[in-house]
């Protein structure tokens, strides 16, 4: 992280700073799928909502772990789709997120966006899954210079969802908002959002370091 901040702080070109943060997004999204999966499982174990789902769980583990599916992403994707349509437990949420990871790894970002929209629109999915889907969707379009009107509206709508620091991934959404504000020369708003993030007691040091780096860039 120190190397990342050094590059950001030493770079005199503001646009390059923003690109540096954004170029890591696809990797971060794929890695984060694992974390979200664990969060969904833990939440549902606490709520006792997953019962007698060993069969579905075994299928999921095999799908994301076996060498045959690693080398055949189409097979993995279709197996996950079967889980989504046949399971009545939170396993389907995990399967849906894994499908997103597959599309991201294939650099099929339009397909990933469509899958994320389906997760967001599913009212039966947990807040953790739908909130993360919003974040992932916003990250995918963050550096897209040719967004249509519909996607611009979705970007604003999805970011506006994170209006309370108690919501999952509020801090990450705040960083994204600040990057977009800087991009659109709304530096006062960006500074306000970043300072709100730094004032919170519920934000990781990693995200606070990113906020500090962006604040330094605003002062140059």
Curated annotation (Swiss-Prot):
One Pfam family this sequence matches: DUF2659
Superkingdom of origin: Bacteria
Keywords linked to the UniProt accession: Membrane, Transmembrane, Transmembrane helix
Main location: membrane
TM region(s), chain numbering: 20-42
Annotated localization: Membrane
Alphabetical list of InterPro entries matching this protein: DUF2659
Topological relation to the membrane, as annotated: Single-pass membrane protein
GO cellular component, one term: membrane
Protein's name according to its UniProt entry: Uncharacterized protein RP231
